[in-house]
Amino acid sequence: MEAVKEKNELFDLDVKVNAKESNDSGAEPRIASKFLCTPGCAKTGSFNSYCC
């Protein structure tokens, strides 16, 4: 039983993750002016505009 206890302790990892919820991304801030928007509207950001 001692070998089993040592094996369990070997894989007993106490991991705490402190993550903050944020909407930050490399694309922020989004363009608010329609002058700089690309033509087209879609749900994706590639070659489409989020300004629509």
Curated annotation (Swiss-Prot):
Crosslink (S-(2-aminovinyl)-D-cysteine (Ser-Cys)) position: S49-C52
InterPro entries: Lantibiotic_typ-A_Bacillales
Post-translational modification: Maturation of lantibiotics involves the enzymatic conversion of Thr, and Ser into dehydrated AA and the formation of thioether bonds with cysteine. The C-terminal lanthionine undergoes decarboxylation. This is followed by membrane translocation and cleavage of the modified precursor. The structure of the 2,3-didehydrobutyrine is not discussed in PubMed:1932575. However, in Fig. 5 the NMR model appears to have the Z-isomer.
Gene Ontology terms: cellular component: extracellular region
Domain of life assignment: Bacteria
Signal peptide positions (record): none
GO terms of molecular function: signaling receptor binding
Covalent link Beta-methyllanthionine (Thr-Cys), residues: T38-C41
Function in brief: Lanthionine-containing peptide antibiotic (lantibiotic) active on Gram-positive bacteria. The bactericidal activity of lantibiotics is based on depolarization of energized bacterial cytoplasmic membranes, initiated by the formation of aqueous transmembrane pores.
The name this protein goes by in its record: Lantibiotic gallidermin
Organism of this sequence: Staphylococcus gallinarum
Gene: gdmA
